[in-house]
């Protein structure tokens, strides 16, 4: 896949760096991706602990926004972790690799993985989605699918989303608010919560 765009979706000054990364994958239909599935990202090595490559799954945040069917988007937070034994801080291998990619860079993707979201047969059924942090990614694709590809949903659609701070509300902050476009849909409501833990 080729990186087409990597845009910061958290405001400057936010403790978290969260990026929306657009990948050109040829024809996404050839991959057979469905809303709710993940792609695998292979990070070439060698790595700190001797692995020849590192593998990480990312849920597809959106598909084919350009109308040609060749793009998918993923939501990536630059992560670090503390080694339990040494107390040392280590950079997340895949998240740092992806956040450092520039347009035109090639990356290895595999997939799809996981089961797609299944909708109830009746469009009058209520839908409840709960996500935290970058866990909002699959719901972004799902809500867009409901209202843009299926022509709407008659049941109540509720999204509950939380983050450590308002600055970390991916796709729901001053820099980017994708869900705002669905607020005029009679059946959609989004609720946010902030918790420092």
Q: What residue ranges belong to the model's regions?
A:
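Ferredoxin-reductase
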Residues: 2-102
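FNR/FR-type flavoprotein reductase catalytic core
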Residues: 92-197
């Amino acid at each position: 896949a080729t990186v087409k765009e990597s845009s910061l979706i958290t405001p400057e000054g936010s403790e978290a760096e969260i990026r929306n990364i657009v990948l050109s994958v040829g024809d996404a239909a050839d991959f057979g991706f469905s809303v709710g599935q993940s792609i695998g990202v292979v990070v070439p090595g060698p790595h700190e602990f001797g692995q020849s490559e590192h593998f990480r799954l990312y849920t597809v945040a959106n598909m084919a926004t350009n109308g040609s069917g060749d793009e998918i988007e993923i939501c990536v937070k630059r992560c670090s972790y503390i080694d339990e034994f040494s107390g040392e801080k280590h950079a997340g291998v895949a998240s740092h690799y992806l956040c450092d990619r520039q347009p035109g860079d090639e990356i290895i993707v595999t997939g799809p993985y996981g089961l797609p979201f299944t909708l109830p047969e009746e469009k009058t059924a209520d839908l409840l989605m709960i996500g935290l942090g970058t866990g909002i990614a699959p719901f972004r694709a799902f809500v867009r699918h409901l209202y843009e590809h299926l022509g709407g949903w008659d049941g109540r659609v509720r999204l509950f989303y939380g983050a450590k701070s308002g600055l970390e509300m991916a796709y729901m902050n001053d820099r980017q608010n994708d869900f705002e476009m669905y607020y005029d849909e009679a059946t959609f409501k989004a609720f946010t919560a902030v918790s420092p833990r």
